[in-house]
Amino acid sequence: MKKIITLLISTFFFIAGCSDNKQEESPLPVEGLEVIADNLEVPWSIEKREDTFYLTERSGNIVKIKDGEVERQSVELEEDVSTASEAGLLGFVLAPDFSESNLAYAYYTYEDGEEQFNRIVTLRLEDRVWREEDLLLDQIPSGTYHHGGRLKIGPDEKLYATAGDASDREIAQDLDSLGGKILRMNLDGSIPGDNPFAGSYVYSFGHRNPQGMTWLSDGTMYASEHGDNANDEINLIEAGENYGWPVIEGSEEQEGMVSPLFTSGDNSTWAPSGMDNFEGKLFVAALRGSAVLEFDLETGESREVITGLGRIRDVQIKDNDLYFISNNTDGRGDPQENDDKLYRISLSNLE
């Protein structure tokens, strides 16, 4: 059982409804922080390749940002995107050879009759339009809440996806279900021969609503996960392990189940989402926590490095800069003027 470090953070929060009357824009709260783009519509994922950003918007668009110019590109999918509650066009990652292939991977929600599912597909960019090309994995459980939805390509060149429990907690322990899992596949959608469960996409299980993934340079994998009202988690992920939900959460322990490296505890909520890492520290977007959080893997300490901008959905680190997106227009935030925004700050400003 891994060491549990319970983090006591005196953060008070509330869930505010989205207002049509946006508040006036406030001064940026951190020295060196700059706005790269604004007026984004519920952005979900950040991808940066050289000097160009690609962001997903939950409504079904991909936003290209280059040299200060913002272009909202259409996405043609085989199924209509469902945007109810937490659903939509969620995870997005560019293929390693994107500069030659114009290929990317996406995770989105759709309705099939009276049912709703998530699926993972490839998209190809042609004439400024993204078109669904191949269906890699379908019928990932979906509900009103807990979609998971993050996509990342690991250092092993496999595609990883987080899948929530779709508010059906029991499926997280069911290895025949894709819900409540971290999934792993080859880039063509096939099941890797070295996955921990033969013939299965399941890489780890017992997750409630995982929304972030990152790998250190040595290949160590971490994931962020929403707890049940509190007890949010940062987990060290290993193939085939059971992370406990719904049997245990937070600092609870049980034989055969892995407890988190960090937890928000019983009285605090982060609602952690996208994450990245730099020099032995994890940087995590926090929705209810309304912050970018830093977790020091050596000392076990944590702190808020960015606050005052509302809900934060995703982060990405490139060339010693931290990029992150706010998520105040998602119906649970308190939008300021010109929200939502893509921000940049040098990591040296956060020391």
Regions found by a protein language model. Give the residues of each.
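Conserved catalytic/binding loops enriched for acidic/polar residues
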Residues: F12
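Short, surface-exposed beta-strand/loop micro-motifs that present aromatic residues
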Residues: G149-R150, R313-V315
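Beta-propeller domain segments
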Residues: S82, A87-L89, D97-S99, A166-E304, ...
